[in-house]
């Protein structure tokens, strides 16, 4: 078997102002739930996604009304826009003309070679990449006939066939996904793909389910794949508000130390020793840091047994006991505060840390 190609060794592909592949960086994506032709609703949903950390957004493009709306949508958002195209090559051409940053197609279902060539040439002329989206539930008939059912080998074979179509047309700005609702199948498919080609991989567990069950299923599957050192972008697919997809994706990346722009909460599971309202405090702090785009580790702990030690491991933290708490910053006690103002005092310190991070980041960027 070939050696696994890790994420930092994949081929860099430019998607709008983002570079996908060629580094340790992972990018979070989502997809709108609105009718794309409804520009106002689609833009409003994308703005909500931007606020919680979505970095690339995909919209369905099933007809001309949707294709005709892409330009107006693109002008009003701040992250790269991807058009999802199936079957009709003319919609892909319209999307490219509208200025989208990437198109998602399967070259095999666009039609004859001359149609694929038109799409590829148009994308090449505008430096727009193409994502090949292989899905276990819609593999080509010949693949199913060969293997009997969806397999990781069949999914990779399908991806390679589609890749060859593009490479034969001298097109290499390619990103590939191999999604399945079966977690084990998805893990195996992505592992095999990472050994078969060096194009960036977009990760996902498709049709994973509702917010609760789907979030757990996605975290299990994506976590296993990420732990292999592969994957360059990801989407958590949920039957829920897409904002929830971003929240789960951010937590998955934070768990693996792969998010450079998100705050992380550490809080204890509670027990009979707790003497403060820790669950309420932890939830309030979690909501507060949800939109902070700085790599700050925040601890909320509820007793004197593990609290002080755990809090010292965080950038900022509080260890509560007997209706009051000790505020820690980088391992040192700042002050003691009563429970009534504990959260507000912690928020102030979080804001100070975030501001320091942004100032340092600005200074470093000015030196480049």
Swiss-Prot record:
Domain of life: Bacteria
Xref: InterPro entries: Dihydropteroate_synth-like_sf, IspG_bac, IspG_bac-typ, NO2/SO3_Rdtase_4Fe4S_sf
Cofactor remark from the record: Binds 1 [4Fe-4S] cluster.
PANTHER family per the UniProt record, alphabetical: 4-HYDROXY-3-METHYLBUT-2-EN-1-YL DIPHOSPHATE SYNTHASE (PTHR30454), 4-HYDROXY-3-METHYLBUT-2-EN-1-YL DIPHOSPHATE SYNTHASE (FERREDOXIN), CHLOROPLASTIC (PTHR30454:SF0)
Name of protein: 4-hydroxy-3-methylbut-2-en-1-yl diphosphate synthase (flavodoxin)
Enzyme Commission code: 1.17.7.3
Cofactor dependency: [4Fe-4S] cluster
Chain positions recorded as [4Fe-4S] cluster binding sites: 268, 271, 303, 310
Gene: ispG
Disulfide bridge partners, by residue number: none
Task performed by this protein: Converts 2C-methyl-D-erythritol 2,4-cyclodiphosphate (ME-2,4cPP) into 1-hydroxy-2-methyl-2-(E)-butenyl 4-diphosphate.
GO biological process: isopentenyl diphosphate biosynthetic process, methylerythritol 4-phosphate pathway; terpenoid biosynthetic process
Reactions the enzyme catalyzes: (2E)-4-hydroxy-3-methylbut-2-enyl diphosphate + oxidized [flavodoxin] + H2O + 2 H(+) = 2-C-methyl-D-erythritol 2,4-cyclic diphosphate + reduced [flavodoxin]
Ranges annotated as spanning the membrane: none
Key words of the record: 4Fe-4S, Iron, Iron-sulfur, Isoprene biosynthesis, Metal-binding, Oxidoreductase
Any one GO MF annotation of this record: 4-hydroxy-3-methylbut-2-en-1-yl diphosphate synthase activity (ferredoxin)
């Amino acid at each position: 078997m070939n050696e696994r190609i890790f994420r930092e060794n994949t081929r860099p592909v430019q998607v709008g102002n983002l570079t996908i592949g060629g580094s340790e960086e992972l990018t979070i994506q989502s997809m709108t739930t609105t009718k794309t032709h409804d520009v106002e609703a689609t833009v409003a949903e994308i703005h909500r996604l931007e606020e919680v950390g979505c970095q690339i957004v995909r919209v369905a493009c099933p007809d001309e009304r949707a294709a005709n709306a892409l330009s107006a949508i693109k002008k009003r958002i701040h992250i790269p826009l991807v058009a999802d195209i199936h079957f009709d090559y003319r919609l892909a051409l319209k999307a490219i003309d509208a200025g989208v940053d990437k198109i998602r197609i399967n070259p095999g279902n666009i039609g004859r070679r001359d149609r694929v060539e038109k799409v590829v040439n148009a994308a090449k002329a505008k430096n727009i990449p193409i994502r090949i989206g292989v899905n276990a539930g819609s593999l080509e008939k010949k693949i199913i006939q060969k293997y009997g059912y969806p397999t990781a080998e069949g999914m990779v074979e399908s991806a390679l066939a589609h890749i060859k179509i593009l490479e034969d047309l001298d097109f290499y700005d390619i990103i590939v996904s191999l999604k399945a609702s079966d977690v084990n199948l998805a893990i195996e498919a992505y592992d095999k793909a990472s050994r078969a080609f060096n194009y960036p991989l977009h990760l996902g567990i498709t049709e994973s389910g509702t917010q609760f069950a789907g979030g757990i299923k996605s975290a299990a599957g994506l976590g296993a794949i990420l732990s292999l050192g592969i994957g360059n972008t990801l989407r958590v697919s949920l039957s829920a508000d897409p904002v929830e997809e971003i929240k789960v994706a951010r937590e998955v990346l934070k768990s693996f130390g792969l998010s450079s722009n998100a705050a992380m909460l550490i809080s204890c599971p509670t027990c009979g020793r707790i003497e403060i309202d820790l669950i309420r405090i932890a939830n309030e702090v979690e909501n507060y840091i949800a939109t902070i785009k700085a790599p700050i580790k925040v601890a909320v702990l509820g007793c004197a047994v593990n609290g002080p030690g755990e809090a010292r491991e965080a950038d900022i933290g509080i260890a509560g006991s007997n209706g009051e708490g000790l505020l820690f910053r980088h391992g040192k006690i700042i002050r003691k505060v009563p429970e009534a103002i504990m959260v507000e005092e912690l928020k102030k310190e979080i804001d100070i840390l975030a501001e320091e991070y942004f100032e340092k980041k600005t200074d470093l960027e000015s030196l480049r």
